[in-house]
Structure formats: structure tokens, C-alpha cells
Regions:
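Adenosine-phosphate binding glycine-rich loop
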Residues: 8, 224-310
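NAD(P)-binding Rossmann-fold cofactor-contacting core
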Residues: 147-170
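Conserved beta-strand elements of the Class I
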Residues: 128-129, 288
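N-terminal ligand-binding/catalytic initiation module
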Residues: 1-106, 114, 124, 268, ...
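Glycine-rich Rossmann-fold phosphate-binding loop(s) that bind the pyrophosphate
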Residues: 133-134
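Rossmann-like adenosine-cofactor binding region
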Residues: 175-260
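N-terminal Rossmann-fold NAD(P) dinucleotide-binding loop
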Residues: 137-138
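Short helix-loop-beta connector
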Residues: 120-127, 149, 209-210
């Protein structure tokens, strides 16, 4: 059995590779080419465990990803999100490979936001805000820089030390001007990415400039929320999956519960955009929101690409 560690993945693929892969994956998802049961969630003491199976119809493999989400302990220096992806031969069910899932998860999630940004953010977007300072936040920044000419990044965290450390890391690795931000900076920002486990909205509509694009990837349970209802009501909302968002997108679930917004107001699933490439032109001058909960086909598509490159 092949075993692939996180540190090996970066040597095989770039973020641009992943964005192209995930864009095609969304089109294939729209065409119904994947068998993908609803993600199962199990609560355990101190955290959440997720299981995500997927099979490409007539494909060579099927995958099952297991993800654990725990708040990092100050005593045990564990990561918040840890995962593994099992790859099986679809002809005989044999286990072919086991991939560390953390880097794949971070890269494909960043890439999904990159795809949405490619279609909905203003082409000359230069200013980015990132909420969160973990691995998911880094790949959000990385993907934004692949699809837009980002010159300045404002970093937001509840912990000033974390925002400074992350800013320095981004500046050094990605060669871009990154600095801790304050809410007033959002009036300058063209694109916002949120990658936090927040249970309270991070900012409000009044904080934003007109025509901003937001990628919200942090909330995956009904009680989690990053984006306020007033923003959702005043934005073109795109989702990775309407079905999954009704179960897992806390921002949207709470907006429907507590405001006049309804799921019928969703503009489109991202797959319909990548497949048809015609709706995004209506939204470039408007606020847009891509709400992603993550889908199993993204892991399968990326592991397929990795196996081809090995």
C-alpha cells in the first residue's frame, strides 16, 4: 500500500494545478459524475469527527476521508484539523493508498475559493482580508494570489501575536505585503476570506465596500457563523452544494432562521458556473458570497491528480 505524507504533496503539485483540478471537479459534480453520500458527523468529547466518501462513476478509485476537528490544546500541541484519505481500487475494493489529508484538505479548500473568486471578484482586485491564521487561512491567501493581482493583505485574528506571526510568514513565503488588520481596513478590501471556527459574525455589511467578494469556509455546523445575515441578504450567494449547505452551512442556516433570507435566494451552485461560464458577469459589480462546506469529490479529484503525478 502506498503511503503519502503531507510534506510530499507540495513537491508534486502547485496551487495553480489544484485550482484547475477543482474547477473541472465542480463541472463534473454538476454533470452528476460522482456518487457522494452526505457527509456523516460524529460528536466526541472535545471535538467533531467527519466522514466523507466519494466515487467517480466508472472511475478507477473511490475515497473515504476521515477528519477530526479539535480545538488545539495548550498542553498538547495538536492541530485543530487532522485528516486521512483512504484510496480504494473501485474494481476489487482493495486499499491502494493512504494519504495524509491535512495538506490536501487545505489546498482543495483554498482552490475552491480560488475558483469562485476567479468568476466573481473584480478582475483588478488588489486588497485582501483574511480572517484566521491556520493552515486553511494560508491556502486561501495562496489561492487568491493565483487568480487576482493581490498587493496587500490584512490579517485578522483574535490573537494579535498570531496575526503578526501569520503576516510575517505570508510576507516571507508568498512575497506580498501582509499586516495585521482592523475592521476599518475592510472599506479598502476587494476580497475577504474567512477561515475560522467562529460562532459569532466576524463583521457586518456596514464594514464593507460595495462590490466585495467573500469566501466563507469556516462554518460547517448549524451553530457556527462567520457571515452576518445582513451581508447574506445583500449579496449574490453561491454555494458548493445546496443540499449540503442546508445541513452544514451555519451562516445560511441562521440567516434563514433569523431574517427574511431564504435558501431559494441562492444564486447558484459553483458547478453550474464552472460548467456554463455565463452567470458571473452579472455579479462582478455586486457583493458576492461563496459559502463552502467542502465536498468529498474535491478530495477524490485531487488524489486522482496526485496519483497520476507519482
Amino acid at each position: 500500500m502506498l503511503s503519502v505524507k503531507d510534506h510530499e504533496i507540495r513537491s508534486l503539485i502547485s496551487m495553480s494545478d489544484v485550482i484547475n483540478c477543482i474547477e473541472q471537479g465542480f463541472s463534473d459534480f454538476y454533470d452528476g459524475l460522482f456518487t457522494m453520500p452526505q457527509r456523516s458527523t460524529m460528536e466526541v468529547e472535545g471535538g467533531t469527527v467527519l466522514s466523507m466518501p466519494c466515487y467517480r462513476k466508472k472511475g478507477e478509485y473511490f475515497t473515504i476521508k476521515v477528519v477530526s476537528v479539535f480545538q488545539p490544546s495548550t498542553k498538547i500541541q495538536s492541530k485543530m484539523i487532522q485528516s486521512s484519505i483512504l484510496i480504494f481500487n473501485s474494481k476489487d475494493g482493495s486499499l491502494k493508498a493512504c494519504f495524509d489529508g491535512d495538506e490536501i484538505t487545505a489546498m482543495r479548500t483554498g482552490a475552491a475559493s480560488g475558483v469562485a473568486t476567479k468568476f466573481f471578484a473584480a478582475p483588478k482586485s488588489k486588497f485582501l482580508a483574511i480572517f484566521g491564521t491556520g493552515a486553511q487561512a494560508f491556502t486561501q491567501v495562496e489561492a487568491m494570489m493565483c487568480v487576482r493581482p493581490i498587493e496587500k493583505i490584512f490579517v485578522f485574528s483574535r490573537n494579535l501575536k498570531s496575526s503578526k506571526t501569520f503576516s510575517n510568514s505570508v510576507s516571507e513565503i508568498l512575497t506580498v505585503n501582509a499586516t495585521p488588520g482592523i475592521l476599518a481596513n475592510l472599506k479598502e478590501v476587494d476580497i475577504i476570506c474567512t477561515a475560522t471556527p467562529s460562532k459569532k459574525e466576524l463583521f457586518n455589511l456596514s464594514n464593507l465596500k460595495e462590490g466585495v467578494h467573500i469566501n466563507a469556509i469556516g462554518s460547517f455546523k448549524s451553530d457556527m457563523i462567520e457571515i452576518s445575515s445582513d451581508i447574506i441578504k445583500n449579496s449574490k450567494t453561491i454555494v458548493d452544494s445546496v443540499v449540503s449547505s442546508k445541513k452544514e452551512a451555519g451562516d445560511l442556516i441562521q440567516a434563514e432562521k433569523n431574517s427574511s433570507w431564504e435558501y431559494e435566494n441562492i444564486f447558484a451552485e459553483l458547478g453550474s458556473i464552472t460548467k456554463n461560464k455565463k452567470y458571473h458577469k452579472e455579479c462582478i459589480q455586486q457583493n458576492s458570497l461563496f459559502k463552502s462546506v467542502g465536498l468529498g469529490f474535491q478530495d477524490l479529484a485531487l488524489t486522482e491528480l496526485l496519483l497520476k503525478k507519482m
